[in-house]
């Protein structure tokens, strides 16, 4: 069983679902135009990941091996429906903004992948923690990419935060600089691709720097005696 520290490290960095596994690229590229949209989808994804991992772990012994994938999909679809109804009731503006990408969480490879590779083989607590930290890793990349695109495209941060957090959140909006016309490349999918590529490259550079700082083991010299 993986330790909590390993689960955190895997979810946030070593096996990040967006930057390492390259899963969930469709919502990552389509929804991350603003921080608000990115954070909203990230929270929804975390809820579904944690819930699906917990349920799959609890019922894993009673699911026949031959039909496990359809059962996992049904569990995930049920949770996504619950999240969609909650968002419709309490964050209707964000619900309209995210649109089809909320129900498409059902097909997100991150969720079905964690259910199959981890939750179905581990106890409930590690499964919940795995879902939490994988979801946090995905949300962190979503928010970071959303911040990059929103700053470059609109010159703002947390625009539309009231859609997620309520009317009081209008005070969170920050205008970093005024733009007369939006930078469309940053707001459209090509800009999202470039942003993801930049984040992946940055992670690889950091990984290389960290690897170079690790003490290297000296090669053992094998002495051969010739007589």
Curated annotation (Swiss-Prot):
It comes from the Bacteria. Its EC number is 7.-.-.-. The chain crosses the membrane at residues 18-38, 39-59, 69-89, 93-113, 125-145, 182-202. It is found in: Cell inner membrane. It is an enzyme of class 7 (translocase). Keywords: Cell inner membrane, Cell membrane, Electron transport, Membrane, Translocase, Transmembrane, Transmembrane helix, Transport. Pfam families: Rnf-Nqr. InterPro entries: NqrDE/RnfAE, RnfE. GO terms for biological process: electron transport chain. The keyword Cell cycle does not apply. One of its GO terms (cellular component) is plasma membrane. The keyword Cell inner membrane applies. Belongs to the NqrDE/RnfAE family. Part of a membrane-bound complex that couples electron transfer with translocation of ions across the membrane. The complex is composed of six subunits: RnfA, RnfB, RnfC, RnfD, RnfE and RnfG. This is Ion-translocating oxidoreductase complex subunit E. It comes from Aliivibrio fischeri (strain MJ11). The lineage of its organism: Bacteria, Pseudomonadati, Pseudomonadota, Gammaproteobacteria, Vibrionales. The gene is rnfE.
């Amino acid at each position: 069983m993986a330790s909590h520290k390993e689960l955190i490290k895997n979810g946030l960095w070593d096996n990040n679902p967006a930057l390492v596994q390259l899963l969930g690229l469709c919502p990552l590229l389509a929804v991350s135009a603003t921080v608000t949209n990115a954070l909203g989808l990230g929270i929804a994804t975390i809820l579904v990941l944690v819930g699906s991992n917990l349920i799959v772990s609890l019922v894993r012994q009673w699911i026949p091996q031959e039909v496990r994938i359809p059962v996992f999909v049904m569990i995930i679809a049920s949770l996504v429906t619950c999240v969609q109804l909650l968002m419709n009731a309490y964050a209707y503006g964000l619900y309209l903004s995210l649109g089809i990408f909320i129900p498409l969480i059902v097909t997100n490879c991150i969720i079905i992948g964690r259910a199959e590779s981890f939750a179905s083989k581990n106890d409930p607590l590690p499964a919940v923690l795995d879902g939490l930290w994988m979801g946090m890793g995905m949300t962190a990349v979503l928010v970071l990419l959303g911040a990059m695109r929103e700053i470059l495209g609109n010159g703002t941060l947390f625009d539309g935060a009231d859609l997620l957090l309520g009317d009081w959140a209008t005070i969170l909006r920050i205008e970093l600089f005024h733009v007369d016309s939006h930078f469309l490349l940053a707001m459209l999918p090509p800009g999202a691709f470039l942003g993801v590529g930049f984040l992946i490259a940055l992670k690889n550079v950091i990984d290389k720097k960290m690897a170079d700082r690790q003490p290297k083991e000296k090669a053992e010299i094998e002495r051969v005696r010739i007589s």
